Amino acid sequence: MNMDKCVIRMAQEKDKVRIMEIYAYARSFMAANGNPNQWKNNNPSKEVIDEDISAGNLYVIEETGTETLDGIKKGADNENSIIHGVFFFRIGEDPTYKVIERGNWLSDDVYGTIHRVAGDGQVHGVLTMAVQFCEQKIKHLRIDTHNDNKIMQHVIEKNGFKRC
């Protein structure tokens, strides 16, 4: 999969089944890799996904411009395009970050928040693409993950984030 052939766009109602598949894959991946407690009980729920889509805060990473085995082109304007990743992004105060238990924020400026990042396991660099997209919208970003999610903690730090 060529990341150059991916676009990021707002999620739409028609994407919901694929989004739920990606989150299901992410839950099983996390459980198999020492993180069985994050997103348990089928979180994020369909209701949360609906709210995120309605609010315009859910984004998908979609592969475009490829061909299937039968030679049919896939792309963002084609129903056969493939969504490989999903993430929540919103600019403005996030209730999750009203209180920081240990440490201090690096900046009190207006910020964007990234939550619920997940990929389908077929591509690498989903978080990197999400961060690059969000950085084009606002300078200051915040992100967090579950204490048991060591893989995501590593990837977050690899993308330039500092623990506060």
Regions found by a protein language model. Give the residues of each.
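Conserved active-site alpha-helix within GNAT-family acetyltransferase domains
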Residues: 148-164
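A short beta-loop-alpha structural element at the N-terminal edge
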Residues: 6-21
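Conserved GNAT acetyl-CoA-binding A-motif
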Residues: 136-148
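Conserved acyl-donor/pantetheine-binding loop and adjacent beta-alpha core of acyl/acetyltransferases
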Residues: 88-122
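Conserved acetyl-CoA-binding loop-helix of GNAT-fold acetyltransferases
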Residues: 119-136, 153-158
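Conserved GNAT-fold acetyl-CoA-binding loop/helix
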Residues: 27-47
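Conserved beta-strand in the GNAT
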Residues: 60, 81-93
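Short hydrophobic/aromatic beta-strand element in the GNAT-like acyltransferase core
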Residues: 57-60, 86, 116, 142
